[in-house]
Amino acid sequence: MSMLRRPLTQLELCEDDIQWLTDQLNKRVLPAVIVPKCEMMDIDEMEPMDQSEPPRGITRRNLRSADRKNRDVPGPSTGECTRTSIAPTLTSARTPVAAPTLTLSTPVNPVSSAEMLRVMPPRVGRRPRASRSGDNDSPLLFNAYDTPQQGINDESPTPSDSPESPNAHLYGATPGNPTSTSGGPSSNTRSHRH
């Protein structure tokens, strides 16, 4: 029984401590929260501050601002209220956040276009290279495997000896042997596949 009483007393003490801490926190936080709420309810210029602080109370403050907007809608000075509410946003603490975004957004667009213009000339420079290689690659499009060997064939007189398989001379095949003519293309493809 004594073993059961000790944890119970400890739990009770913990609960008492938790309740005491929560009471103190409520006593300290509530007046601090109530004061700005009263100020915000009384002063219309604090509405943008409500919107600029979403993590503390999103739903309540947004509802309050929406209610105020709805109350201002039937009035003839709706535009004036919105303008006055926008003016404090620029003069409030949100200005350092909004000002750099506005100042950065305007020059970033021309800079990005200039960067795009700067990037394009290298691409245009690469295109002539591709066109040059394309001019040189025109035989490669027809004979992808034979192009390096065609250069060798042009220098050597052997291609006249083997008209059926232009690369047969590289593999030691002669046109007189029927096995060489039949095995020539297969040997070419096998050797080039590796």
Curated annotation (Swiss-Prot):
Function: Probable component of the anaphase promoting complex/cyclosome (APC/C), a cell cycle-regulated E3 ubiquitin ligase that controls progression through mitosis and the G1 phase of the cell cycle. The APC/C complex acts by mediating ubiquitination and subsequent degradation of target proteins. Developmental role in early embryogenesis and the metaphase to anaphase transition in meiosis and mitosis. Required for embryonic anterior-posterior axis formation.
Pathway assigned to this chain's UniProt record: Protein modification; protein ubiquitination
Comp. bias regions, Low complexity: 154-166, 174-194
GO cellular component terms, A-Z: anaphase-promoting complex
Subunit-level organization: The APC/C complex is probably composed of at least 12 subunits: apc-2, apc-10, apc-11, cdc-26, emb-1, emb-27, emb-30, mat-1, mat-2, mat-3, such-1 and gfi-3.
Species assigned in the record: Caenorhabditis elegans
Example GO biological process: anaphase-promoting complex-dependent catabolic process
Main location: nucleus
Similarity-based family: Belongs to the CDC26 family.
Classification lineage: Eukaryota, Metazoa, Ecdysozoa, Nematoda, Chromadorea
Record key words, sorted: Cell cycle, Cell division, Developmental protein, Meiosis, Mitosis, Nucleus, Ubl conjugation pathway
Domain of life: Eukaryota
Changes seen on gene knockout: RNAi-mediated knockdown results in arrest at metaphase during meiosis I in early embryos. Defective embryonic polarity due to improper first cell division.
Comp. bias (Polar residues): 79-94, 102-112
Compartmental location: Nucleus
Name of protein: Anaphase-promoting complex subunit CDC26
Region (Disordered): 47-194
